Amino acid sequence: MMRLFAVLLCVVVLVPAASAQPAPQDRAPDDEVRQHLRTRIEAQRRGLDALAVEGETAQASAAVQAFYEDRQFAPVWVGPSGPTPAVDRLLTVLERADRDGLPPAAYYVDDLQALLNEIRAASGTDAGRLADLELLSTDAFLLYGSHLLTGRVSPTELEPSWNVEGRRGDLVSVLREAARTGAVAEALQSLRPPQSEYAHLKTALQRYRRLAARGGWPAVPDGESLKLGAHGPRVDSLRRRLAKTDDLTAERSAAPDSFGVALETAVVTFQERHGLEADGVVGPATRAALNVSADARAEQVAVNLERWRWLPQSLGRRHVLVNIAAFRLRVVEEGEDVLRMRAIIGRPYRQTPVFSGAISYLVLNPYWHVPHSIATKDKLPEIKKDPDYLARQQFEVLRGWGADAQPIDPSTIDWSRLSASNFPYRLRQRPGPLNALGQVKFMFPNRHSVYLHDTPTRGLFARAERSFSSGCVRVEKPIELAEYLLANQTQWAADRIQTALNTSAAERSVFLPEPVPVHLQYWTAWADADGTVHFRADVYQRDDAVHRALSDRVQ
């Protein structure tokens, strides 16, 4: 027996007086369906019962009610002859929801198909079953549309610190237009993220799912590192593995178990796509990435498609985009990258938060006002071990955080008596070559107290994995970024910036005439326009939670 459908009304229908209704044979099926819809939805509005999803409240019950009341309960998916072609078009779209990384089962595909088959087998005359189909189809459209528009998973449930305003839209209006034109697929297509990155990832998802369906790729067995000149069956496994993902495109060697130059080049290509040290040597890290299954990579792509659905309609005509998981910063203008650089992000226990803001000013030769947590956890132990630590590292000690706080002599403080619970001081590092913020910081005021900044520790940018900060983002090319942001201010030409940095140790704020949006996001997979797919390690261990939530049948 068929399961209860998503938007069936569990109501006790009050039968009107016979004189108030035309005889059944005098009424078209869609007229009877309209009456069923009116009775059920008005009962729901009066609180007599609720639209139900297999006994649960319908996912889009409020929108369903608003839609039908606005059109005087006229059906969309049912006509005088029964189900319309629009139902089939909707079903086709829903069956392809997995192309967006969404589970078709969440949109009642099996129930819709079974109900449609039942109605057509019975010549489509049962008004009650037609009303069931009508309500189920509408709820499926609205639910799928809402997931394309804002995501299936609530980012704030997974990340309480999430602070990005997502897209908004009037789904009832979209459905109304689809009902008017019959363009169901086009209406739902309009709800997808407009960014090209989303479309590229969709293509990547299909590619990796095809690879998985064909058996994936061979594993590279454990053993010593493989490099140029190596021989043996493990080299042949490596060759076949890299060919599956088109990292190895050169003609197959006459000696497939020999590690030649073409294979070394393919290894470097793979390493670059995965954010690994691109040395052409297959060590433990590279082998681990090679042996991640095609299914797992497809899931990773689906997770990152969802992350795009959480974002605003527009990131800004020009904007700064930090991919935390990739340790990269891009400056984008009119959809094109105009500046790229490496970045250093927060350690796993001091994670860089995901949020959006707007860079409104720069600070040249900044002081570093050490956060209380860092002062007590990191700096206080150093001070206790070495009385000269503060002077050598150019720190000042102030009592309190007010603007009028004055420096005090650190030698007058009994540091041994202090701890995190009774530390009343503020540490401030003077501008200069030792300053942790380097020569410039980029400010976008936010509740996380996070910003972009230079760093004197330049060597860390050479590392493949760059999670070394306390939450803020260190940028590889701070002067180039400053020059870009100040390019339209004639008084701040490149030479003037260098002069201000090199001839004065005084802190100076420079405000932008127009704030520039900045987005700190977390993507572990993305695809280029040429089809190159990139993956990164899940440094903050966030992918699994999104994947589990996406995989649930009902949210």
Describe the residue ranges of each PLM region.
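Cationic-aromatic interfacial patches
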Residues: 22-165
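Bacterial N-terminal signal peptides
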Residues: 6-16
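Well-ordered beta-sheet/strand-loop patches within structured domains
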Residues: 20-69, 135, 139-143, 162, ...
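Positively charged n-region of N-terminal signal peptides that target proteins for export
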Residues: 1-4
